[in-house]
From Swiss-Prot:
Annotated heme b b566 binding sites: H97, H196
Organism listed in the record: Tetrodontophora bielanensis (Giant springtail)
GO molecular function: metal ion binding; ubiquinol-cytochrome-c reductase activity
Protein name per UniProt: Cytochrome b
Gene: MT-CYB
PROSITE patterns per UniProt: CYTB_CTER (PS51003), CYTB_NTER (PS51002)
UniProt membrane topology term: Multi-pass membrane protein
Cofactor(s) named in the record: heme b
Miscellaneous notes: Heme 1 (or BL or b562) is low-potential and absorbs at about 562 nm, and heme 2 (or BH or b566) is high-potential and absorbs at about 566 nm.
Signal peptide (residue range): none
Phylogenetic classification of the source organism: Eukaryota, Metazoa, Ecdysozoa, Arthropoda, Hexapoda
Length: 377
């Protein structure tokens, strides 16, 4: 007799994705981050909806509405802090998830990978819009600096900047549209996520050995669902500990001041999870070149399926590529650190060196793997 989870049209879809999904028996903890990203997205949407009920998207009262949420709304302080630190957790999981896919060459599943990179852009856009909403000093100047980069586009630049701003400066129309886009994008991300999962379940998951696992798969539940629950408990515990013990650790002190167009902060910088891209932007002396490098810092991930033709699936079989990969991870960490430093020597030359090294990885890595395959033959 068929159970309801196998017969009901809607429940059957969920069942085939979460319960009876055939999963490789040997996938490790590194495969947990997909479900953790889903959890982060749900957490952000739930906390965001409650914040939107009390937030006012008007430059005269936006900052005060945040103060109102923190002081007067029942548990508003907790909701806001979980939402702010949840974004950091989201990006930690996102970067670990991306790093794992690069290491194990999961980008060979081209449709899934392409959709994943598009989702990364959408999440980055959502986070940037959200950073502007408190209308503190760093919110205002961050929005001014980043949106002003559009002016580097030939011919259309100035028109695009004024179109995004809704005027001749970052002002009320800018805040209103940023709030609207910040509210809508997560729902677009949910749609993209479903497409991402659809593509993934067409081919099945990769595994640490990089071998075809069709002969040796088990249902996702109960083993992997309980395994994912361990990850959920760990990251949610970490999020709560951070939010309750040191809630503003990852924020910027400048944002405790209301936005003032007449006073420029000493060091304008985005949130920590964008600092690697910001360091790449700053390392190019030319404005247009910097914008191109900024976009390429993430969009270069699109070329990985085209440039990397490994005979074996995954860096675990390529010792020199493993070294290259961990050097690349260290480059990203160092770029993040450089992005938070002032624009002065020796940080300028260090940023330029690290930027060159960052992009060289995507050129050298396929060449080294080709040489290794050639030697094995």
């Amino acid at each position: 007799m068929m159970t309801i989870r196998n017969s009901h049209p809607l429940i059957k879809i969920v069942n085939n994705s979460l319960v009876d999904l055939p999963a490789p028996i040997n996938i490790s903890t590194w495969w947990n981050f997909g479900s953790l990203l889903g959890l982060c997205l749900i957490t952000q949407i739930m906390t965001g909806l409650f914040l939107a009920m009390h937030y006012t998207s008007d430059i005269a009262s936006a900052f005060n509405s945040i103060v109102h949420i923190m002081r007067d709304v029942n548990n508003g302080w907790l909701i806001r802090i979980i939402h702010a630190n949840g974004a950091s957790l989201f990006f930690i999981c996102l970067y670990l998830h991306t790093g794992r896919n690069i290491y194990y060459n999961s980008f060979n599943q081209i449709s899934t990978w392409t959709m994943g990179v598009i989702l990364m852009f959408l999440v980055m856009g959502t986070a940037f819009m959200g950073y502007v909403l408190p209308w503190g000093q760093m919110s205002f100047w961050g929005a001014t600096v980043i949106t002003n980069l559009l002016s580097a586009i030939p011919y259309l630049g100035n028109f695009l900047v004024q179109w995004v701003w809704g005027g001749f400066a970052v002002s009320n129309p800018t805040l209103t549209r940023f709030f609207m886009i910040h509210f809508l994008l997560p729902f677009l991300i949910i749609g993209g996520l479903l497409v991402h999962l659809l593509f993934l379940h067409q081919t099945g998951s990769n595994n640490p050995l990089g071998l075809n696992s069709n002969q040796d798969k088990i249902p996702f539940h109960p083993l992997f669902s309980y395994k994912d629950l361990v990850g959920v408990l760990i990251i949610m515990s970490g999020l709560l500990l951070l939010s309750l013990l040191s809630p503003f650790l990852l924020g910027d002190a400048e944002n405790f001041y209301p936005a003032n167009p007449l006073v420029t902060p000493v060091h304008i910088q985005p949130e920590w999870y964008f600092l690697f891209a910001y360091a790449i932007l700053r390392s190019i002396p030319n404005k247009l070149g910097g914008v191109i490098a900024l976009v390429l810092s993430v969009s270069i991930l699109f070329i990985l399926p085209l440039s990397s033709k490994f005979k074996m699936q995954g860096n675990q079989f390529y010792p020199f590529n493993q070294i290259m990969f961990w050097v690349f991870i260290n480059l990203v960490i160092m770029l993040t650190w450089i992005g938070a430093r002032p624009v002065e020597e020796p940080f300028i030359i260090m940023g330029q060196t690290l930027t060159c090294s960052y992009f060289m990885y995507f050129i050298l890595n396929p060449m080294i793997s080709y040489l290794w395959d050639y030697n094995l033959n």
